[in-house]
Amino acid sequence: MFGRAPKKSDNTKYYEVLGVSKNATPEDLKKAYRKAAIKNHPDKGGDPEKFKEIGQAYEVLNDPEKREIYDQYGEEGLKEGMGGGGGVHDPFDIFQSFFGGGGFGGGGSSRGRRQRRGEDVVHPLKVSLEDLYNGTSKKLSLSRNVLCTKCKGKGSKSGASMNCASCQGSGMKVSIRQLGPGMIQQMQHPCNECKGTGEMISDKDRCPQCKGEKVVQQKKVLEVHVEKGMQNGQKITFPGEADEAPDTVTGDIVFVLQQKEHPKFKRKGDDLFYEHSLSLTEALCGFQFVLTHLDNRQLLIKSNPGEVIKPDQFKGINDEGMPMYQRPFMRGKLYIHFSVDFPDSLTPDQCKALESVLPSRNASRLTDMEIDECEETTMHDVNIEEEMRRKQHQQAQEAYDEDDEGHGGAQRVQCAQQ
């Protein structure tokens, strides 16, 4: 972060917590921490807050860079450089890294090393509407990291590792830059030597199978079951199948369903919508057609005798929609949306034939005198949606231009005064 160099504040507290002088050597700090940590460990009836304070003091004073900041600026300097609480790790993790996994006398701590949770791995899974209607299974081959079986995830032949000398086993480094008089920049970043692990393994001791990486790649085939009625965006989870890592609870592999567009059917919840066009003759005189459903069943769709279908009319069929998720014997509705195709023009004879069977035209006819008093107009075809979009864009542009003319000058003058 960037900021003013913090004022000097109390820089003796951490030394007092460990019971050492300000000139204490790293060996003095280790001895003091060992004694204080064992005495105050919660598993031995100690005070958790005191134990946390001891771990915090040791982590700061055992790191040469953090200790330098603390000696110069106290806790305030650490907070400004590392955000809030000084970037301190879990006190139990510090204890475990110091004493190893055995805890007290090999019996192990009841709390143990706190494991972090690994990241979930998310994959999109494309499915058709037919897949969601009928249900399906898909086999997918994936590569993932698993703990090396030869070294059991230790990375070494002996199963041992050393704390990184560069970062004192914390995995993090703090760098300080002087930007100018009274201005400093402090940044925390992963240690370059150990790549943030806090551990180092000698070349001779590296595991020959994983080369010290602790994990190896494994190919695995997962069978994903897509159940009837599942939705676009729904997740299918395989717990604990993501990448493995030491001291880490393995995350999940998550498949997110992505439904492909269907040319005829649209889905809304548990209902299906189907578009169908009728000729004017069919709309007026009746129709029938075969609808091929998502499971390839053939449905006969026909109008009732004497029924007239209007443009944009909907008809519904019960229990022919989507299966309901985890209730596959219950289904939504199938709605058919009708559009009517009108002829582009009619001959005079066709008009007379239609007039003979259709309701007569409006009885009120205009006289020649009334027509002479009117102004003639010419109609043209329009795409109403495109027209509305164009008008909205034009109105928005005019409003923007008006606002710029009304306030732009005053704002520029104000900025000039500042």
Swiss-Prot record:
| Residues of the J domain | 11-76
> In this UniProt entry, which residues carry a covalently attached lipid of the kind S-farnesyl cysteine?
C415
Region Disordered: start and end of each range? 382-418
Write down the InterPro entries for this protein, in alphabetical order. DnaJ, DnaJ_C, DnaJ_domain, DnaJ_domain_CS, DNJA1/2-like, HSP40/DnaJ_pept-bd, HSP_DnaJ_Cys-rich_dom, HSP_DnaJ_Cys-rich_dom_sf
**GO process terms (BP):** protein folding; response to heat
Organism for this UniProt entry = Allium porrum
Q: Where are the zinc fingers (CR-type)?
A: 135-219
Report the CDD domains cross-referenced here: DnaJ, DnaJ_C, DnaJ_zf
So where does this one cross the membrane? Answer: none
Membrane topology term: Lipid-anchor
Propeptide at 416-418
| Keywords from the named record | Chaperone, Lipoprotein, Membrane, Metal-binding, Methylation, Prenylation, Repeat, Zinc, Zinc-finger
Record-level Gene Ontology MF annotations: ATP binding; Hsp70 protein binding; unfolded protein binding; zinc ion binding
Protein name, please?
Answer: DnaJ protein homolog 2
Q: Name where it's found.
A: Membrane
Name positions with the PTM Cysteine methyl ester. C415
Under SMART domains, the record lists: DnaJ (SM00271)
The function of this protein is: Plays a continuous role in plant development probably in the structural organization of compartments.
* Residue ranges the record marks as coiled coil: none
Q: CXXCXGXG motif repeat boundaries?
A: 148-155, 164-171, 191-198, 207-214
Q: One GO cellular component from the entry?
A: endoplasmic reticulum
